[in-house]
C-alpha cells in the first residue's frame, strides 16, 4: 500500500478541514453544536436502553438480539469516543485544533466502529442463514456460543481494518495539522471496500437466501396443515365430534431456538414454540435495520471513495460534512426502529421510562 498524501483533498473521511463550516460563533457553528449535542444524547440514551432492556428482560434474550446488543455497543462507543471531537471540529468550522496523534486515534476509532456496525449486520445475516438452511445442526449447537464467537470475530476484524491508521500510515509528508482526515488514498479505498462495498452485497445475498428459505418452508407447512385437516362428510347431518375444526395455533417461523416443528405441537413443545415466536419477531425488524444503515451510509462511502479515486474531482467540503452527519444519525435510528417494529422492545422501553420518570 502506497503512502501518497491526500493533503490536496478536502476531508476524505469526515470533512474535518477548513471550509466545512462558518467558524465558531457563526449560525452554522451554533447549528452544529445544538445538533451534535442532541445527536450524542439520543445515541447514548437509545442504545443504552437497548443494552439494559436485553440484559434485564428474558424475553429479549434471543440469538438475534445478542448481535443487536453488539451493534448498540458500537453506537455507544461512537457517541463517547468519536462524536464529541467531530462536533467540536464542526463548531470550529472544520479546523482541527488538537494533536495529529489524537486525530489518528479518532480516525482509527471512526473506521473501526463503522466497520463493526456493518460486520455485525453481516454476522446476523450469516447466523440467520445457517439457522434456516441447516436448522437441526444449528439447534444441536445452540446456546449462545456460536453467536459470541461471531461477535468476537466481527470486532477483531474491525480492529484489523482500522489498525494501519495507528501504525503510522496517516503520517504523510506535507500533512496539514489543521485538517483531520485519512491521508493515504490507497487506504481510503481499502477501508471503504473492506468496511462497506464488499460486506454489503454478501449481507444482502444471505438475507435474500434466508427469507426465500423461510417462504418455502411456510408454503410446505401450509400444504401439510391443509392435507391433515379432516374432511367433512358429504351427506346431511352434523359432523362427528372428531371432525369439528378447532382454531389453529399461530404459525411459527423456524429459528435457532426450535427445530422445524410439526404442524400440531404437543404440550411438551409449547415453550419451544413461544421462543420461536420471539425469534420471529426479532427477525422481522432486521430488514428495516439493514435498510436504514444502507440509506444513511451509502452516500458517505460513495463520496469517500470518489475523493480517493478521482483526485481531480472537486468534492465540496460541505457535501463531505453532510454525508458524514447522515451516517452518524444512523446510530440514533436503531433504537427507534426497535420501538416501532418490535412489540417486546416497545413494552420494555415503556417500563424503563416509567421507572425513570
Swiss-Prot record:
One of its GO terms (cellular component) is synapse. It is a multi-pass membrane protein. The keyword Chloroplast does not apply. Disulfide bonds join 103-180, 310-313. Residues 233-242 have a biased composition (Pro residues). InterPro entries: Dopamine_D4_rcpt (IPR002185), Dopamine_rcpt (IPR000929), GPCR_Rhodpsn (IPR000276), GPCR_Rhodpsn_7TM (IPR017452). It is found in: Cell membrane. CDD domains: 7tmA_D4_dopamine_R. A lipid is attached at residue 357 (S-palmitoyl cysteine). The keyword tRNA-binding does not apply. Pfam families: 7tm_1. Residues 243-259 have a biased composition (Low complexity). GO terms for molecular function: dopamine binding; dopamine neurotransmitter receptor activity, coupled via Gi/Go; G protein-coupled receptor activity; metal ion binding. Residues 1-32, 89-104, 171-186, 308-316 are extracellular. Na(+) binds at residues 75, 117. Residues 56-65, 127-146, 209-284, 340-357 are cytoplasmic. Its main location: membrane. GO terms for biological process: adenylate cyclase-inhibiting dopamine receptor signaling pathway; negative regulation of cytosolic calcium ion concentration; negative regulation of synaptic transmission, glutamatergic; phospholipase C-activating dopamine receptor signaling pathway; regulation of circadian rhythm; regulation of dopamine secretion; regulation of potassium ion transport; rhythmic process. The chain crosses the membrane at residues 33-55, 66-88, 105-126, 147-170, 187-208, 285-307, 317-339. Keywords: Biological rhythms, Cell membrane, Disulfide bond, G-protein coupled receptor, Glycoprotein, Lipoprotein, Membrane, Metal-binding, Palmitate, Receptor, Sodium, Transducer, Transmembrane, Transmembrane helix, Ubl conjugation. Polyubiquitinated by the BCR(KLHL12) E3 ubiquitin ligase complex: polyubiquitination does not lead to degradation of DRD4 protein. Palmitoylated. Palmitoylation of the C-terminal Cys is important for normal expression at the cell membrane. This is D(4) dopamine receptor.
Amino acid at each position: 500500500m502506497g503512502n501518497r498524501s491526500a493533503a490536496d483533498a478536502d476531508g476524505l473521511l469526515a470533512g474535518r478541514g477548513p471550509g466545512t463550516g462558518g467558524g465558531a460563533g457563526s449560525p452554522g457553528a451554533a447549528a452544529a453544536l445544538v445538533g451534535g449535542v442532541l445527536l450524542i444524547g439520543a445515541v447514548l440514551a437509545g442504545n443504552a436502553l437497548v443494552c439494559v432492556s436485553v440484559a434485564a428482560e428474558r424475553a429479549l434474550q434471543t440469538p438475534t438480539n445478542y448481535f443487536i446488543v453488539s451493534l448498540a455497543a458500537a453506537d455507544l462507543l461512537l457517541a463517547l469516543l468519536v462524536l464529541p471531537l467531530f462536533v467540536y471540529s464542526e463548531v470550529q468550522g472544520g479546523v482541527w485544533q488538537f494533536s495529529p496523534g489524537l486525530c489518528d486515534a479518532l480516525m482509527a476509532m471512526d473506521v473501526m466502529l463503522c466497520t463493526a456496525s456493518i460486520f455485525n449486520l453481516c454476522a446476523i445475516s450469516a447466523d440467520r442463514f445457517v439457522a434456516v438452511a441447516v436448522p437441526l445442526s444449528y439447534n444441536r449447537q445452540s446456546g449462545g456460543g456460536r453467536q459470541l464467537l461471531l461477535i468476537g470475530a466481527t470486532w477483531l476484524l474491525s480492529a484489523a481494518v482500522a489498525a494501519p491508521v495507528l501504525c503510522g500510515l496517516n503520517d504523510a509528508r506535507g500533512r496539514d495539522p489543521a485538517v483531520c482526515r485519512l491521508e493515504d488514498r490507497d487506504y481510503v479505498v481499502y477501508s471503504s471496500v473492506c468496511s462497506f462495498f464488499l460486506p454489503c452485497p454478501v449481507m444482502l445475498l444471505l438475507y435474500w437466501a434466508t427469507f426465500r428459505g423461510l417462504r418455502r418452508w411456510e408454503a410446505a407447512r401450509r400444504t401439510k396443515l391443509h392435507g391433515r385437516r379432516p374432511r367433512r362428510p358429504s351427506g346431511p347431518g352434523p359432523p362427528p365430534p372428531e371432525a369439528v375444526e378447532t382454531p389453529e395455533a399461530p404459525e411459527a417461523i423456524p429459528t435457532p431456538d426450535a427445530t422445524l416443528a410439526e404442524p400440531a405441537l404437543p404440550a411438551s413443545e409449547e415453550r419451544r414454540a413461544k421462543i420461536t415466536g420471539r425469534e420471529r419477531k426479532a427477525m422481522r425488524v432486521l430488514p428495516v435495520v439493514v435498510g436504514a444503515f444502507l440509506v444513511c451510509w451509502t452516500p458517505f462511502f460513495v463520496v469517500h471513495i470518489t475523493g480517493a479515486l478521482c483526485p481531480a474531482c472537486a468534492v465540496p467540503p460541505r457535501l463531505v460534512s453532510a454525508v458524514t452527519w447522515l451516517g452518524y444519525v444512523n446510530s440514533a435510528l436503531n433504537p427507534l426502529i426497535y420501538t416501532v417494529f418490535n412489540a417486546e422492545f416497545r413494552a420494555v422501553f415503556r417500563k424503563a421510562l416509567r421507572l425513570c420518570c
